[in-house]
Amino acid sequence: MEGLEVKVLNYSEVLEDNFTYRIDAEFFKKIYLEEEKIIAKLGFEEAKNIIVVKGGKRLPEGHDFLNNKSGIPYIRAEDIKNGFVDYTNSPTISLLTHREIKAYQTEYNDVLMTIVGNSIGDIGIVKFNLDICNLTENAVRLITKKINPEYLFSFLESKFGQNYIERNKVGTAQPKLSIERIRKIKIPIVSSEFQDEIESLVSSAFEKLQKSKETYQAAQNLLLDHLGLKDFNPPAQAVNVKSFSDSFGRSGRLDAEFYQEKYEGYLKKIQAYPYGCEPIRTVCKLKDANYTPKDNQTYQYIELSNIGNLGEITGASLDLGCNLPSRARRKVSKNDVIVSSVEGSLASCAIVSEQYHQALCSTGFYVVSSEKINSETLLILFKSEPIQQLLKQGCSGTILTAINKDEFLNIPLPLVDANIQTQIADLIRQSNYLRIKSKGLLEKAKKAVELAIEKDQESALDFIKGKQTNDCNVH
């Protein structure tokens, strides 16, 4: 029996808070039962008594997303992660579509939770003010009535909230968490003073994240200004006449999309850069050799879902080599830049930090480094509108549209002035510093909630205010 977890329960205990009559051992793990007792001892309210739970809505039949960013944001599950809901990359819908699902809008200070799929249990708090913004059916809105939304957010992010979600989800291929289960979450009762302190931490985290985004945007603007592309409007004519020698004879492409005039407009501007430009194949070193993971060695594995909007790696899965997917074949090093090759996620680019040195990434990324352009400037270049458009132009395929190796290596990059590169690097480092500080404050709020539940609120308040405690390892 050594190594096995055994728990004997009375029939009445099995049925307690078990309206779906689950009898699988997974549901009665020791950790789940212990945490339930801790919360019961502290005192709690069921969610249904202090919050309103509302589902999202899928697009109505016959409606689709717009092909531009001028519409109404539609928050997806992937937009709800890393603490704050971000609609920067959300698809948009028309006003007509919105009117069909207007009952499913998000509002300021809503706490959003994903309830379907592998991302189930991701939590985000809405800190933007938009008149209209819709929510996917794969998430729910939690509207607080009697508690602070920041406290609710931090509790759900804590091990107590996440373990409840893990315990109560059902299904394997496509796990789900029912709204009824969410309404039965036991939320610990804490003082208004403690909730206010959590609110202060989360608000400070949001402010730092906003400054991080502004600093990142400053780096983007600096580059585009320097390249003369800040307010550039490419040609938008629907027809572009080409001879055979200037079309298929040169590119091997017959699809009309490839020959849109806007691509030529961006290309000419880059080629006119006074300090010159060179194709990626001569500016960068491409790391495309396959690495075969060792079966019994543990690796960090980075995939598309781990790339943030500010060019950062937000996390990685940890697993033995024998369990990794066949696409986990690229080994990355500190300061490498990884660039997605798949259309629809071409903007998923990131710098590899020290934390992910020697990690593996998907073969869906190109891994590059350069002696002519620093990593921070490479990142901003690859995420800039001109290079994004040229990457999109190079994409081909039917089932999985992506840019192949030759097309990628032929894209020209401007040899950005060294002084501008230094300024961009400084801005990106500032942005990263602020983002890490923001993440640390959210972690502190989460740990404080755990400490308040496991020990007492006084210890948690001391921890928040910087007094020493042995109960939590947060720096």
Where are these regions (language model features)?
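Non-catalytic DNA-recognition/assembly elements of restriction-modification systems
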Residues: 1-59, 191-293, 418-475
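A short beta-sheet element
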Residues: 76, 102-104, 112-155, 338-382
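A structural connector/turn signal
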Residues: 100-101, 172, 326-327, 355, ...
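A short glycine-rich beta-alpha junction/loop motif
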Residues: 132-140, 170-193, 345, 359-366, ...
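Short coil/turn segments at secondary-structure boundaries
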Residues: 60-67, 167-169, 234-239, 293-301, ...
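Ordered, small/hydrophobic-rich secondary-structure cores
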Residues: 115, 123, 131, 136, ...
